[in-house]
């Protein structure tokens, strides 16, 4: 599977940045979006030596109209998109004793509605053309509820459910959809974590795994494998076994 034109949100740092550079090295023309224009300009400059090209389109994914305009401009500039990676997101820990509305509202706007705005802009085009591939970056934290992740985990669970719901309908039109569920990846976001992160991998490693999974047409691209399978086992546990484990996480934190 080859892609000539790609759009990636959340491209300024972390997984998005590494993924863009990987695709540019393969010769793709990659439109990149993030809120911080300086990050995108630096990314485009770093990609100068690649066989592909990186084109900055600064954007706040919570602005529906801005997302639609950006997709219009991108396709006018580089042509119909082959692959869209909806990667923009944030993490805000929420503890029960400091429970408040704002982190939920913020993460719903960025993590969920940011993806919805992207899908609303590209899916009608893909369906009309009967081709295209969209990848939604969620997280293994969306598999099941975890302490301090009431907002973040819920937002990522929504993305997984959304992708599962859309897949059988998009299959009818030849449009691919994938959901990416990483474990811990070393990025500026995870650098803020104050707890151990087992099986931590680098952003370049994550980008390679994502590209490999997308090329193979996988619906779910989850990594690293041992960490993912541990979470999938937890997802199957009855509450009588699951909650004693998560209570230990609260005690240890």
Residues of each region from the PLM?
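Residue(s) in the substrate-gating loop at a strand-loop-helix junction
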Residues: 139
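Substrate-binding pocket helix/loop in short-chain dehydrogenase/reductase
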Residues: 95-96, 100-108
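Active-site helix of classical SDR
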Residues: 119, 155
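The beta1-alpha1 cofactor-binding region of Rossmann-like NAD(H)/NADP(H)-dependent oxidoreductases
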Residues: 58-69, 101
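Conserved glycine-rich cofactor-binding loop
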Residues: 10-13
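Conserved glycine-rich Rossmann-like NAD(P)H-binding loop of the short-chain dehydrogenase/reductase
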Residues: 28-43
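C-terminal helical subdomain
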Residues: 179, 195-230
């Amino acid at each position: 599977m080859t892609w000539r034109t790609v759009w990636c949100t959340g491209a300024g740092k972390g997984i998005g940045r590494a993924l863009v550079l990987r695709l540019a090295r393969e010769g793709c023309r990659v439109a990149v979006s993030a809120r911080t224009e300086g990050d995108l300009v630096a990314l485009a400059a770093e990609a100068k030596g690649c066989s592909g090209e990186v084109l900055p389109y600064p954007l706040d994914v919570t602005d529906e109209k801005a997302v639609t305009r950006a997709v219009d401009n991108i396709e006018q500039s580089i042509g119909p998109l082959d692959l869209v990676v909806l990667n923009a997101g944030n993490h805000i820990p929420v503890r029960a004793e400091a429970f408040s509305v704002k982190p939920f509202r913020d993460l719903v706007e960025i993590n969920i509605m940011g993806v919805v705005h992207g899908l609303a802009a590209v899916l009608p085009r893909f369906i009309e053309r009967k081709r295209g591939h969209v990848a939604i970056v969620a997280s293994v934290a969306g598999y099941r509820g975890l302490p301090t992740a009431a907002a973040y985990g819920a937002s990522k669970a929504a993305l997984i459910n959304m992708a599962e719901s859309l897949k059988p309908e998009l299959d009818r039109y030849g449009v691919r959809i994938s959901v990416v569920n990483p474990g811990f990846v070393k990025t500026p976001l995870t650098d803020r974590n104050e707890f151990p992160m087992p099986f931590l991998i680098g952003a370049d490693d994550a980008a390679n795994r994502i590209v490999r999974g997308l090329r193979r047409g996988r619906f779910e691209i989850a990594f690293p494998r041992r960490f993912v399978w541990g979470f999938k086992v937890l997802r199957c546990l009855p509450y009588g076994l699951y909650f004693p484990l998560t209570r230990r996480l609260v005690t240890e934190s």
